[in-house]
Amino acid sequence: MILKKLSVLNYKNILQSEVIFSPKMNCFFGNNGMGKTNLLDAIHYLSFCKSHVNTPDSQIINSDQDLCVVQGNYDYEGREEEIFCAMRRRQRKQFKRNKKEYDKLSEHIGLLPLVMVSPADADLIRGGSDERRRFLDLIISQQDKPYLHALIQYNKALLQRNTLLKDQSMDASLYEVLEMQLGMYGQIVYEKRKKLVEDFTPIFNEYYQTICGSAEEVGLHYISQLEETELAGKLAMSRERDRILGYTSSGIHKDELEMTLGGYLIRRVGSQGQNKTYLIALKLAQFAFLNKRGQTTPILLLDDIFDKLDASRVEQIIKLVSENGFGQIFITDTNRKYLDEILLAMNHDYALFRVERGEVQPMEE
């Protein structure tokens, strides 16, 4: 899959831009705050109907404007695809595929597989468990529609049960229906998350060791209450306690993904360089996983990934992304030197752009 052209209007600080891309490597350089990350975020938006950092749509629209438009023209295995998104303040956003609007945004997820690596990924290590669950959900949802459906239905039932709890409702029949749904959909989510972690961890370990050049092992450990008990029954037993708390205290929305380095939690023992390497390896493994199981090669977005890495690790990453297994790549950096090194290391078509004050200018070499 190739993104051939991106048209942007009022996406954060990018007021108006139309960019034609290389089918292989696209490099963007410029100072911080100029719009490099926003450009990659607009590409991410076309795949997931949302910002990489979960920015509300109202904050995506340029602060001086009322309308934001993002459109991408893709070559999808020889087939033309046009994806269009328009957002207006205080209105429902439009999301269209080939000029036909989606009934549900969830129908779009997985069509345009994409992996983004950015400084915001640090929250996977230092943030709460919801960040790590979201990471698992994002991988599975791109290649498994039944999983996405189960996750959406689980969250709907969870919201309804929490509303009953806050309202101090005593309607046992309503609780029973919702707890049955939570149990059924929660079991689907649990089993698929568990299987993903089992299949994904060896790939992740291989990428980490390749980048850092050592045999130090990394690990992912999925911890869930469903390992020991059936959810619907547990919810029925904890109903009175949950009513006092005002929320549902058990379920797959409480699951944890432990991330370890050398057998210890990385958030406790990892240096800045180790954390950065860990996250890059995690995302490159995500790319490899999706590429192997999907119908088309994902797009890879690499946003400012070389900061806080020593020269040997930078060299290994450049070598990895220069390999033929990676499809179309978009990479940003304030330091053009790293971008030039990547372009020298690979024998592929490329495009180089300068980003300044929200304007994207192609560079003639």
UniProtKB/Swiss-Prot annotation:
The gene is recF. NCBIfam families: recf. It is found in: Cytoplasm. Pfam families: SMC_N. GO terms for cellular component: cytoplasm. This is DNA replication and repair protein RecF. It comes from Parabacteroides distasonis (strain ATCC 8503 / DSM 20701 / CIP 104284 / JCM 5825 / NCTC 11152). GO terms for molecular function: ATP binding; single-stranded DNA binding. One of its GO terms (biological process) is double-strand break repair. PROSITE patterns: RECF_1, RECF_2. Its main location: cytoplasm.
